[in-house]
Amino acid sequence: MSDPYMPLTSVRSGAGFEAAKGVHGLTVQIANVYFIQLPSEPHSFVLIDAGMPQSAGVIVNEAKQRFGEGFQLKAIILTHGHFDHIGAIEEILEHWDVPVYIHSREMPYVTGKEDYPPARPDSKSGLVAKLSPLFPRHSIDISSHVQALPEDGSVPFLDEWMWIATPGHTPGHISLFRDDGRVLVAGDAVITVEQEKMADVLIQKQELHGPPAYFTPDTETAAESILKLAGLEPEALLTGHGIPMTGKNFRSDLTELANRLSSI
């Protein structure tokens, strides 16, 4: 059973947006999900992450608007298993019998075997950080649908994409990259809003930040993951929280952010 609705939101909640060629985004309260279109099947897509609890209807309605009533959901790729990225997955799977893929190190958190560590409300100042002990961190069990991503870095159904291990925020966090357009779907490895601060979350103030500190137990590894992403030289940065960034100006900022995090 999914968690109850959580009254955390932003001014962009419910807004769909074209994130990159063939990639459509949707802000679900405080988190983003992405619909990646299959090039050969214009009405088919892979869903990246599954939003906040009780958001299945919003996600499905956006899919209908973007891909038509006869849309085909091929699979769901999870960047990790935190509540704001898997919130609607159980309800979605009740209606669509599709495979779910996640890094092997995240499997315990989505097969009912292990809960995430407790939140760290004092890791960084801000009201959201203070509230973080109230956020769900328990495991869900979607054993009948979930499987580990291929070890070779390929992404099922998405031949142009590769997945990259970006641990730190969680042990098996991943990001996705497509060379065409140098598009990076970062998940929470790096985000574009200071997620710890309620006011910034509410207005979606665009700034480059590391993963939410209150749910990031390994800051040093998170910094190494950001350096890895900087090395990809992305030109479109699509994050789990915040407004996407495009161009090349943010590349050096990624390196500076990693260096700043590693010194904490």
Swiss-Prot record:
Residues noted as binding Zn(2+) 1 in the record, renumbered to the chain: 80, 82, 169, 188
GO molecular function, a single term: metal ion binding
Stated induction or repression of this protein's expression: Expression is under strict control of the medium composition. Induced by citrate, probably via the two-component regulatory system CitT/CitS. Repressed by rapidly metabolized carbon sources like glucose, glycerol and inositol, via the carbon catabolite repression system. Is also repressed by succinate and glutamate, albeit to a lesser extent.
Amino-acid positions noted as binding Zn(2+) 2 in the UniProt annotation, renumbered to this chain: 84-85, 188, 241
EC number annotated for this UniProt entry: 3.-.-.-
Listed cofactors: Zn(2+)
InterPro entries hit by this protein: Metallo-B-lactamas, NDM-1-like, RibonucZ/Hydroxyglut_hydro
Gene3D superfamilies the record matches: Ribonuclease Z/Hydroxyacylglutathione hydrolase-like (3.60.15.10)
Keywords of the record: Hydrolase, Metal-binding, Zinc
Cofactor note: Binds 2 Zn(2+) ions per subunit.
SUPFAM superfamilies: Metallo-hydrolase/oxidoreductase
Highest taxon above the source species: Bacteria
Enzyme class: hydrolase
Disulfide pairings: none
Family: Belongs to the metallo-beta-lactamase superfamily.
Name under which the protein is recorded: Probable metallo-hydrolase YflN
Phylogenetic lineage: Bacteria, Bacillati, Bacillota, Bacilli, Bacillales
